[in-house]
Amino acid sequence: MNRFRAWLFRLGELFQKERRDRDLSAEMDSHLQLHIEDNLHAGMSRAEAQRQALIKLGGVEQTKEMVRDLRALPLLESLLQDIRYGVRMLLKNPGFTFVAVLTLALGIGVNTAVYSLAEAFLVRPLSLPNLHRLVAITTGQKSPVAAADYLDCKTQGQSFEQLAAYRASDMNLTGSGEPERVYGAAVTAGFFTALGVAPVRGRGFLIGEDEPGHDQVAILSYRLWQRRFGADPVALGKTVNIDGKPYTMIGVMDRSVEFPVPTDLWIPLALSPKEKVNRAANSLHLVARLKDNVSLSTARAEMTLLGRQLADAYPNTNKDRQFDVLPLVEYVEGSITRAYTVLMLAVVGIVLLVACANVANLQFTRASSRRSELAIREAFGAGRARLVRQMLTESILLALLGAAAGLLFAKFCLWLCVSKMPPYVVRLWAGFDKIRLDAGALFFTMAAALISGILAGILPAVASSKHHTTDGLREGGRGATVGRGTRRLRSAFVTAQVAVALVLVVGAALLIKGFRQMTGSAEAYSPERVLILGVNLPASKYPQTGERLAFYRKALADLSSLPGAQSVAAFSCYPLSNNGAIWGYFQVLGRVAPDLRHSPWADMQTISPEYLGLMHVALLAGREFTSDDREATQPVALVSQKLAQRYWPGESALGKQIRIGGPADSGPWLTVVGITADVLYDWTNQVPPPTIYRPLTQAPQAASLLGIRTVGDPASLGQATRARIASIDPELPAFDLKPLDVAIHESTVGLGYTGAMMGILGLIALAVAVVGIYGIMAYTVGERTNEFGVRIAMGAQREDILWLASRHGLLISAAAFAIGLPAAIAGARFLAGLIYGTSPGDPVVFAGVPIILFAAVLTAGYIPAHRATRVDPLAALRYE
């Protein structure tokens, strides 16, 4: 306790130094006067009395210094001295301070912004307690589980405190307002217990309410309760219709609970007796809470063993099926969202390193002008460690100022991201409503600032402290030039900056070009004249194939009669949607695969006969579907050109037969009656995959979209289209009604923003690299000014001087390109796996970007090099 009090007393001394010094001086003067008076009384003269008093006290100033040392914290006090001195030096050089702070603000700001986005998309969508104990059980590749397998996992799994299943889908909500399409989840009774959450109003599902006949209850999300029911507590207990069936609303979940995101409501998952023994249809997602003493590896080992046991017991369905256990966070992260977020984190991290390298170069340049100052401080007793600490303190001060400005820049970036993003993306991408600068972002910013300050300052500080006192005191002579090692280090920094700028600009160019090529391919479908809308026919209201077909026939006929409608079609997915393309296995007659793993796969599409004409998809061979292709006739299919060439090379695919499903499935064989041009339905594919089309009349359960090609503006038919659908079924909402070009833009806008952001970051890196080139060239020319003057006086031509001055910059550029081009090629291969149209060896990009970058670097180096040709030789000779 006494030591702690002493420490607090010493800490207080730092902030009351002037008052304490005044008190100490007064006390010392008082003691001195007392000794002088005693000596005077002893008969001494005043001069002798004062001399003897000073001798007795041991020297006033020495005593004061001893007292100060006893009551001070030397390390902290010297650190405060470094901070005060550093602030004065930064204020003394406002130009340097502004450029360094701006550079670090850009680097730290974009890192903070992307960190906040990553936290919102990859962490906050699951605002659940004890998230580390929540896991998902899959059958590999995040695939769902069959109902019978789920029941086995539930009864035999010993690693889980609670295990539940859910099935998420779009649902039609009617009653208490206009018909609305919502995203819902059918869940087992223990679902919310497994998640560790409970309703904030009403109650949760009871045991037995997930059995057929007892499942007519629903729980609302907080968002839906507010939006549709005005947050009215009286809404609980009332009845709404979900997919045509009545449900009583019994509870409201907390606003933070939206799993599986972004869910609007939850209903019980009532498995029928037939479903409970079904092992063929993998349709359930499993979520579980681990027991306190069980690790993820233990649960994974248990499920792996259970999977093997089920494979032995049920080889027909479970032979190639293996269970896996994943952290729930990893399971719910979209692979595309994660890939692009990780990509952006890597890019902005590189930008921050470039910013640190640039600030380090600035500090190298500044250190050369401070050598006299550092030499004088060393001559007065400052050790090398103290000099390094002083310069590191200044670097960290710069980084902290950059962090403060970077927070403002990050806040602006996040505002721009949220405010300018289309509502479709905000709704689809869970996490947008959670984007904010929170305590985690502030901590990240401070950590980034400290790391940046150290990275940007450590090498200049160490290099500057190596010079001897006599070298620094010869300021103005040729001995004041920096050493070869320092010059090489600065050149290495600039080389790295140019190389990184090359990689980023190439990546941005590839993304932007791929995005433009992809969206440009949509022009072939003339999307600006097509209106699309979604309809979700609930199985409870349309259980029979004939009922579904009757609805589509009526809808197509009614929509065809709209004024301005040219053609109407039903289909399951539109081009470049990335939100509805369904792939599945199939078999080729005569070449049935030995197992599911070796089975070929393709995009599966269901279309009405008018679809190819509506979307301007070319029929390359054979015929289109017709009204004669009915359920009772020969099952038929259209295949894409890629599928035909892959599985029947050198021969016609017409008349060949395929079957949807795995080797064990017993579906009908489909006869290929036509070959279509390739269409890219999912833009995350690098190339259009093989596609199989089935007629609506033979597979009506898969269609969910209607399209109308119009003469004029398709948006003008919006209200009339809704009215026609309502006239057929008043409880059926027509959702996502919009022109096709708008829908395609909304589905690809995230990629466009990624390309634009990478482009901006690439330009920032390029600007920083150009400034670095200019700085090192300007300093090199300044160092060699007298040499150039002497050369001119000795007869050197200005072209020779221009070459000598610019050679260093050209060598840096050559080294940067030698490093950057292979890295850019490697990055291009990664991007090629993310987006259609991105070629890892695009000649235009890989030729154009280096040329542009070289021109920028050449321009930056030419300005100081040209200045070298104008050196006055007489002034140089006088100096010599």
Language-model-detected regions and their locations in the chain:
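Negatively charged linear elements and acidic catalytic determinants
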Residues: 1-102, 289, 308, 312, ...
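Mid-to-C-terminal secondary-structure elements
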Residues: 6, 170, 183-207, 216-342, ...
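Alpha-helical transmembrane segments of integral membrane proteins
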Residues: 67-98, 328-334, 362-389, 393, ...
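Short, strongly hydrophobic transmembrane alpha-helices
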Residues: 95-121, 125, 354-356, 399-404, ...
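Membrane-proximal juxtamembrane linkers immediately C-terminal to transmembrane helices
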Residues: 114-137, 156-160, 198, 261, ...
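Short juxtamembrane loops and helix-capping segments at transmembrane helix boundaries
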Residues: 118-136, 258, 264-274, 325-334, ...
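Membrane-proximal extracellular/periplasmic loop immediately following the first transmembrane helix
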Residues: 126-170, 282-287, 302, 522-585
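Interfacial "coupling" helices/loops that link adjacent transmembrane helices in transporter permeases
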Residues: 355-399, 481, 771-810, 817, ...
